[in-house]
């Protein structure tokens, strides 16, 4: 599963995220035991991962980003961090240039699809992306221009075991799962015999 961590939307449609019900709802999500059905977010993979995530948030806020919700460790044992929303993130911030492995999202305001694509492709990472559009052809055109290993259109949740999984750039090379994943386990050999 790939979770979208960076949302890029047109400035003309952007509303104050603090007024949106989804952002407000994030502050009410429960962290805890991932085996408990009432839990929304389990712990991060390690104490170091939780520390890195909080450092990315603190770095962004110290350099002018707006923390809309979350951003703090959850009290008690375990590598838990609150669900977090950041806006006004710039290229000088770690949250802009580093992969985020935590329950957080960075919201960018862009002029149009071209700027969103340029911003997305400027990342050193390229595991996956999601395109939302009412126009299927426009969504496909944007997906074709994204430098990522996977793109979902109008849903970040679609998945099946026979679909190839993998990224581009620093998010990896090659694919796992599906027929393309089998190629990762096959040694191919070229044998050349000159004519004559």
Model-derived regions: residue spans:
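Extended low-complexity, polyampholyte segments enriched in Ser/Thr/Pro and acidic residues
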Residues: 1-2
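NAD(P)-dependent aldehyde/semialdehyde dehydrogenase
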Residues: 8-124
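Conserved C-terminal structural/oligomerization subdomain of aldehyde/semialdehyde dehydrogenase
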Residues: 30-31, 73, 80-196
